[in-house]
Amino acid sequence: MRLKCISMLIIGLLLSGVSAQEEAVNKAMEKDDSKDLKVGDIAPSWALMYAPGQFEFLKNWSEEEGKRLRKFTSQPNRNAVVMSFFATWCQPCMKELPILENVYQKYKDERIKFFLVDITEATRTIPGNENLPKAGPFLQKKGVTMQILYDTRGTVMKRYNAQTLPRLFMMDGNRQLTLTRRGFHAGEEEKFTKELSEEIERLLAELPPLKNAKE
């Protein structure tokens, strides 16, 4: 009985430590809600690294109406985009990730791109974050197969005012935001899955017809 009590005490201390760390990080990353991007806004463009020396561009898949995609000749078809900011210290992110992965598996062959934007490195200088696990191996162990993009300096995080995590954005093929979410709470898994799936179906139905690539 005594051993069980000690074990429970240790677990409690560990959980409180994680919670305190997360609270400290969020406080250090104070945000201004007035700068939030809203549905109908044009999503800020970005280029983010996914491997050393290799970059993904939002404009490869989604661009303002009337403008061509970045690689129009080889990839002329607009896609809807789902992007979620996360960090390995973020506990609510760990609740959102399995749902995103399940939805991704359902739609990965459709005209919609899923991106996880990691800000772990951008927040590593905050006290307590020095030894956080790197996102790639961390997510691989959790069975996450979505594309990870690394916002190592937090530049894109600031453009999207995504300091409170997880922070999710959905946009159509014209880079117009159609859904935004901040945070994730236990018990909303079913609601989130339904909301995400319905919006994806709507966006896919509204995409323009496929075009042939011009090599």
What is each PLM-predicted segment?
Residues 61-64, 163, 184:
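A generic structural motif
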Residues 84-90, 118-120:
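Aromatic-flanked redox-active Cys/Sec active sites in thiol-based oxidoreductases
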Residues 82-83, 114, 168:
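Hydrophobic beta-strand anchors of alpha/beta hydrolase catalytic cores
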Residues 1-61, 179-181, 212-215:
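N-terminal targeting signals for export/organelle localization
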Residues 94-141, 152-159:
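Structural microenvironment flanking redox-active thiols in thiol-disulfide oxidoreductases
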Residues 170-215:
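Thiol-/selenol-based redox modules, centered on thioredoxin-like
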Residues 143-147, 161-169:
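Structural micro-motif
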Residues 47-81:
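A short beta-strand-turn-helix
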